[in-house]
Amino acid sequence: MVNAQQLELLIQNTLEPTHIEIQDMSGGCGQNFEVIIVSPLFEGKSTLARHRLVNHKLQEVIKDIHAFTQKCYSPAQWEALQAK
């Protein structure tokens, strides 16, 4: 079973995030996660390319999760969202 701390550590070690938010939507069961990842690695990439990058980097844990929802932003996009 995957927990939010393990997922956060893996994201920190593989995606160079400047901001991470992780919610376990399964009540602590580790089967349904929603994540927000802000990383300069996403700069200039389409949404599909960002998701593919995340899926590739996290493939070892995603295979054990029933549902994984991701929102991926570049630092500039995240700043713009926060300014609204």
UniProtKB/Swiss-Prot annotation:
Q: Which domain of life is it from?
A: Eukaryota
Supply one GO BP term: cellular response to iron ion starvation
Gene Ontology cellular-component annotations: cytoplasm; cytosol; nucleus
Q: Check the record and name the InterPro entries matching this protein.
A: BOL2 (IPR045115), BolA (IPR002634), BolA-like_sf (IPR036065)
In alphabetical order, the GO MF annotations are:
2 iron, 2 sulfur cluster binding; iron-sulfur cluster binding; protein sequestering activity
Q: Which Gene3D superfamilies match?
A: BolA-like
What's this protein's family per the entry? Belongs to the BolA/IbaG family.
Task: Indicate what this protein is called per its UniProt record.
Answer: Uncharacterized bolA-like protein C8C9.11
Give the source species: Schizosaccharomyces pombe (strain 972 / ATCC 24843) (Fission yeast)
Q: What is the lineage of its organism?
A: Eukaryota, Fungi, Dikarya, Ascomycota, Taphrinomycotina
